[in-house]
Amino acid sequence: MENRKNYFHLHLISDSTGETLIAAGRAAAAQFQSSHALEHVYPLIRNRKQLMQVMDAVDGAPGIVLYTIVDRELAGLIDQRCREIGVPCVSVLDPIIELFQSYLGSPSRRRSGAQHVMDAEYFARIEALNFTMDHDDGQVPSDFNEADVVLVGVSRTSKTPTSIYLANRGIKTANIPIVPGVPLPDALLKATKPLIVGLIASAERLSQVRQHRVLGTTQSFHGEDYTDRAAIAEELKYARSLCARNNWPLIDVTRRSIEETAAAIVALRPRLR
């Protein structure tokens, strides 16, 4: 017999990509660390036949059902089948949409994937992603002034994943490594437009991450001091000094997720929101 205290099935049914549901489901599941959610994601469910196949899967692995289905008939079928199976279900967006309708005094469009319209904002994200990929790890330093954000930091401070996350929000982001003894490009030091932010982490954390990175490679490829905590501490001291000298804010990413780091960066300049 399945032990719900250890794990549970989480069924995510969407008529679009399922991204909204996945984010909501994971945010809720993260509050229950003693139980592991086994995710079952069903995107692009838009007709009765597809839905019935999904509900058969739910019947075979009972658990929590979350859904975002704008078609009222299909949503009603989910509620009905969940009652028959004996599992709880929640329409994630309905309470929010109803609140909006009540406050704004107008009905919603009830359109699948309405947040994924290929509008100006969509193309701005594509442009930001292209810019960010072209300016990863110090590439094309001559046009740093075209960036919204430039991240600087020693190796393994999550510069690249944070840059990509910001780019997905339409924020053009470049990043460049800080290496003691290697001067930063003049174009960066003279840039006036971008928000320049330094990323740091504890020497212990960086040593652990770097040790994982060198697995399968030779230590000499990275340098003998790459994972040495004392050497890393000196790198961090240099990075802090460099950022202080240029009045660049510092963010410690030791205990931050990529999302939390990105939120802290955006908070430094509200116009990025």
From Swiss-Prot:
Coiled coil regions, renumbered to chain: none
Reactions accelerated catalytically: N(tele)-phospho-L-histidyl/L-threonyl-[pyruvate, phosphate dikinase] + ADP = N(tele)-phospho-L-histidyl/O-phospho-L-threonyl-[pyruvate, phosphate dikinase] + AMP + H(+); N(tele)-phospho-L-histidyl/O-phospho-L-threonyl-[pyruvate, phosphate dikinase] + phosphate + H(+) = N(tele)-phospho-L-histidyl/L-threonyl-[pyruvate, phosphate dikinase] + diphosphate
Organism per entry: Rhizobium meliloti (strain 1021)
This protein's name: Putative pyruvate, phosphate dikinase regulatory protein
NCBIfam families: PRK05339.1
GO molecular function terms attached to this record: ADP binding; ATP binding; phosphotransferase activity, phosphate group as acceptor; protein serine/threonine kinase activity
EC numbers on record: 2.7.11.32, 2.7.4.27
HAMAP family in UniProt: PDRP
Keywords in alphabetical order: Kinase, Nucleotide-binding, Serine/threonine-protein kinase, Transferase
